[in-house]
Amino acid sequence: MYVSTCKGGATGQYTYVRLMESYRDENGKVKHKVVQNLGRLDILSQSDPNYLENLKKKYQEDYAEKNRLQSLNRLAQVQNLLSFDNNSSAGAPLPLLQYGHYLLKKIWDDHLHLDRKFKDIQHRQTKAKFDLNAVVSYLCFLKILDPHSVFYSFGDQDGFLGAPVQGIGLDSYYNSYDYLFEHKDSIMKFFNRSINNQLGKTKATLIFYDVTHVYFETALTDLECGRQQMDFQDRLQEEVQLAYESGELDAACFDKEGRLVPGQKTDDFIKKIQAQKIEYLRMRGPSKEHRFDLPLTSIALVINEEGIPIDFYVYAGNASEFKTMAASIESLKQKYNVKESIVVADRGLNSAANLKMLQSNDLGFLMAQKVSNLDQKTTKAMFDPEGYVPIIRQGEEVARFKVVKDWTKKGKRKAEDTKCTLVLTFDKKRQKRDLAVLEVWKQLVLKKQAQGIKVKPKSSGWASIAKTSEKTEARIEGIDEETFEAKRRLAGYAALVYKNAPNCQDNDAVPDGRLAAAYHELNQIESCFRIMKSHLGLRPMYVRNSNHIKGHILICVIALGILKLLQWKLNKSGTPLTISEIIRALNSATTVPIKSGDELMFLQCSRPQNIRKGLERLSQEELKAELAKRRKQPNQLEILFKTVGLVPPARLVNLKEMGRCLGVRLTTEEAIPELVKDML
């Protein structure tokens, strides 16, 4: 019990004293109840001016005595454990169970309320006979803790405290991907509302957009396998209906059964559908990871300023990034009523047509611009040192920028021309890097020349500085000195284009200095892709039908959102951790269950991992002293517990205490996976 006060009276003029008690309901949630109302503080203090302080001290002493008795009881339990029969399980080792997923479950249930969403989907809109929320949350948590295929994840379920997916068959795991695909839009909408509630925002000011490709470890594309997207026929029927209603197709284009018949209009319609690339998903195409030999899928990701996903879109591996951007933005606007925001994107998506498209959707833009494509007048202004504003950090100039107002981005057609603000930047570190890359390219070209390698004209990368005498593919003759010197002169320079949303009230929504700094934020979405690929198992994919592919991507996107939200909370509380540190700390949450008579005890343990990081140059004595000092501070796992609103368990706890720390009600029957119980 503990002492609490509350206001009362007609105008809240009185303070009342009461005894309170904490308890857990049937769902394991912490609740509070009034044990006794002691009365008004002003009356109680008449006989003892320090009444409230003395009362609190009394119950604190009672609490301390309770803790002392618990410690004595714990000591007796440890002594009992040390004397257990060593031959009870024929010398087999005790199982090691993970419980880091309970911290993720806390975010899933209490911060984002995703358990409610999936229970609602199952209750109202699916025929699932299994616990959909249990399977989806388990797959999502495992993407963070130890990403693998669905098949491997199913086999790994017995290594987790609380048996999160006990009794659910493998087929249900794959079926959950079908439900994820079917309800993707409603799930992402709910996810966004929950995220905005956590961040205290109503809409994103800056929206980051980029595209990546993921590969499949299979030799054949969907076209070569004859495997259409699962929803292709439905999408085709929708396109036919729209074409008929708009007059693109007329009655003469159909036979009596409603099938398309050959003809000019029909042929044009089929070509349009083929250009949309909606029939096949896994196709060969451009790959930033140079996996041109494998089928790919294209993923367009939209994130907010905190790096938390807003939505994603999946396209065929051979679809054009330029063409799919319009479809993604249109869908984003319809689903989330996004307007007056600024879309931030890399230069690979910067075209006059896309900029015009964004403006027509009442969106602004902030995109990287190739400095090699600037006109002669603008290039001259870029090299002119006059007008540049220095960017100072820690008393030292690290970069400088210049703003060119009313600059025109030229399109293929006059109608696509867009007036905007051009921001030119120069960075000494970037100059050093660019020059180093050019030298590497130069040596590579000379090496390729000696090998008799052929290149095509207007190639990118190292081949762009290779000299040839033919207009087609030809042998390298040396270094194209003119191109090489032009690239050397551009080293260190970069640019971006900016324009606010057409209907935005504040025409100077982003100050010039903020524009220059925003250039560095373009890497944020690339970081999200790296996290999903390196830490969350986005690729390679081990599913093949289009619905399961999109379900898998949704799982990875939600996992990214959970990690980014957790990282945001850590930064806000002044205890920042990297994504790698968060994952490593979660995986260190391991416990050994031990039977002590009829009671189940849990001994916390973990394997030391890379504890020398950052201390490699210290002597053994210095290292021991530094680690001893660090152990007096909360470790990373303890920080995570505090951030999500849980309490880390002591080194040795019983079943009830373990459940209390993890915010759940653990029972003897459910705490240990069924197949592991015989190991105790």
Language-model-derived ranges and their functions:
Residues 258, 265-266, 294-297, 314, ...:
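An anionic, glycine-rich sequence signature occurring as long contiguous blocks
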Residues 19, 153, 208-211, 307, ...:
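Conserved structural-core and active-site-/substrate-pathway-adjacent residues in large, well-folded domains
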Residues 320, 344-353, 371-373, 547-550:
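Acidic, metal-coordinating catalytic cores used for nucleic-acid/nucleotide bond scission
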Residues 26, 160-167, 200, 305-308, ...:
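Secondary-structure transition/capping motifs at alpha-helix termini
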Residues 39, 545-566:
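Basic, amphipathic alpha-helical segments enriched in Lys/Arg and hydrophobic/aromatic residues
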Residues 1-277, 293, 300-313, 318, ...:
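Dynamic "connector" segments at or just before major functional cores
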Residues 514-542:
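Short amphipathic alpha-helical "interface-anchor" segments enriched in bulky aromatics
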Residues 313-335:
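Active-site beta-loop-alpha junctions of metal-dependent nucleic acid enzymes
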